[in-house]
Amino acid sequence: MGKPMSKNLLKAGYELVVFDFNKDAVKEVTECGAVSAASGREVAEQCGVVITMVPNSPHVRAAVLGENGVADGAKPGTVLIDMSSIDPTESKDIGAELAKKGIDMLDAPVSGGEPKAIDGTLSVMVGGKKELFDKYYDMLMVMAGSVVYVGELVPATWQSWQTRLWLL
């Protein structure tokens, strides 16, 4: 879902530096105006805000804390917005590791699937510092029909899980 979300950000005028192991996805997004990077580290070296959207908890951990990951290139004050739907304890642990390096994290799992990612009508539940939510609200709304602040870092992931269980 990261590809259509990226395209919506580009259409809204945001400049993007992108990395993905899926080279076809990177090619498609760079053809729309993004710049490609060789790693998450390289993205973080060039950006003050990094958005991750990957399939699961191990992928987020690798992309953020792994070798050549976001944390390797991020400077203090960088903000990570993880839009993946991952295990809440993993989100909390990643946020704690980033905080040690002066990196803030917003947990912003999405609901709605690829069709809603394409048309920019995802639902996003955001956890983290309220001032960061306020600062990045407009950017998140480019990808969503609904962006809701749910409190500190972990409650967003819990809320996402509860919503999924409710829908079952």
Kindly label every feature range from the protein language model:
Residues V29-E31, G48-I51, V64, I118-T121, ...:
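Short secondary-structure transition/capping segments
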Residues S85-L165:
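Rossmann-fold dinucleotide-binding core
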